[in-house]
Every structure is written in structure tokens, then in C-alpha cells.
Amino acid sequence: MAKLTQANEDYLEAIVMLAGADRLPVRSVDLASRLGVSKPSVNKAVTLLKEEGFIEQQPYGDIFLTDAGAAYGEAVLERHNTLTRFFTEVLGVKADIAENEACCIEHVISEDTFQRWTEHIRQSLDCCPAK
């Protein structure tokens, strides 16, 4: 599976959020609104994501996640949510700062490092409950 740029991971993550668990179709206009970008920017990203096999779309139609796209996007979203929760709930970082920093880190942390980190946190919290 190809490694996407940070921007394209953001598009895929947003598609996953908009599609929801039922993988509903996503409209380009909703994607543009969610990310605060122009429709031409969405079209460019959608073209690349189609070429990489992460989404399907008929000309000017709704966007559908492929299995590969859902897996990749859900992994990015999981990293984002886990990092955000760690920053806010464990470290006490303000929500807006935690959100921004999680968005930066989610794109550069490897899957291996993320899995090892989450396992370490789980073990640390299980063995050392808050007083």
C-alpha cells in the first residue's frame, strides 16, 4: 500500500469520518466543506486517491471508500483520536492544542511505533492506576 502525503491522508481521514461506519457515499462538496478547501482541491485529491485504489467515484458522482481506503483512513483516524485523548486526558493539554498536535504526529508516526506506544500506555495505566 502506498504511503500518502499528509494532505491526502487528511482527505482520506475526512472521507472515513463523513462516510461513517456504514460507508455511506460522500459528496465532494461535503468533503470540501469539512476540510475548508476548494472544490478543485478536492477533485485533485480524489483523482489521486482513485489512482491509488483508495476510493471509487463515477465522473462527478459520490465518493465511495474501497476496503483499502477504509483500512488506511481508519488507521489514520485511530492514531488521531488516540493521540488526542492521550494529550488531553493523560497530559492535560488543552483540547485545541491536542487536536492540532495529534494531526501533525498522526502522519509521521509509523504503525509499528504507534502500536508499541499504545501497548506501553495500556500496560502503564493498568499497572499504575490513578490515585
Located regions from the model:
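Basic, amphipathic "hinge/linker" alpha-helix immediately C-terminal to the N-terminal HTH DNA-binding motif
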Residues: G61-H80
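Key DNA-contact positions within bacterial/archaeal DNA-binding proteins
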Residues: P40, D96
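N-terminal helix-turn-helix DNA-binding core of bacterial DNA-binding proteins
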Residues: A2-V37
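C-terminal regulatory/oligomerization modules of transcriptional regulators
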Residues: N100-K131
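Helix-turn-helix DNA-binding elements, focusing on the entry/boundary residues of the two helices
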Residues: S28, V46, T84
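Basic amphipathic alpha-helical segments that dock to polyanions
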Residues: Y11, L31, V42-E52
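A short, conserved structural fragment
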Residues: K50-Y60
